[in-house]
Amino acid sequence: MRYGDTHKAETHAKLVRLAGRVLREKGPQNLTVAALMQAAGLTHGGFYAHFKSKDALLVEALESVFEESGQTLHSVTDGLPPRHALARYIDVYMAPAHRDNPSAGCPIVALNSELPRQSRKFRTAFDVGVKLLLGKLAGWIKAAGSTEGEALAASVLSAMAGAVAVSRAISDKRLSNELLGAARASIKARLGLSEVVL
């Protein structure tokens, strides 16, 4: 069967997308080439027509999930003034929907404990993604009137990711929701956003 000119690129993108979901949901150690290719409806041997190695796939999938996170960030904050954008992003990031859907959530929360066991290229791609998000948060924080944009952004991102990670680990949904709500309110109060109405 002859495929169209775009078939290889479409298949490649599909593999990266599937790998990104598995990466966030189960971690890099549980992403196997055989299972990925089967999920894509392809043969195991076809993998190497798209990637040099599993590590190359992992790096590309990680870059893709950070790009997806950036698109989500943009979609929920587009057109809002900085204070409102920051408040909106905190609300979305620290919502039960984010906690309950790790395969589509922030890669920082899903992967931070995995990094020490990953390749240098993977860790570098993670660093790049984190720095881009920190830059966006710092920009909003500065535009909202703070003089400590970068330091505050680092602290806020760490608190948000930590709260979501802990809330995912708690099996008691009521307690998990309380933790998320308290952390969200605390972070917004710290940023002077408690009164921002969206």
Regions found by a protein language model. Name each.
Residues M1-E10, L193-L198:
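N-terminal intrinsically disordered/low-complexity leader segments
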Residues H12-A13, V33, D55, V59, ...:
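Short, structured helix-loop boundary elements
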Residues K14, L18-A56, E60:
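Helix-turn-helix
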Residues E60, H74-G105, A153-V156:
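Hydrophobic alpha-helical connector segments
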Residues E63-S69:
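Short, basic, alpha-helical segments at the C-terminal edge of helix-turn-helix-like DNA-binding modules
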Residues A95-H98, P107-R117:
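Helix-loop "lid/cap" segments that line or gate small-molecule binding pockets
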Residues S119-V128, L132, I141-L198:
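Hydrophobic/aromatic-rich alpha-helical bundle segments in the mid-to-C-terminal region
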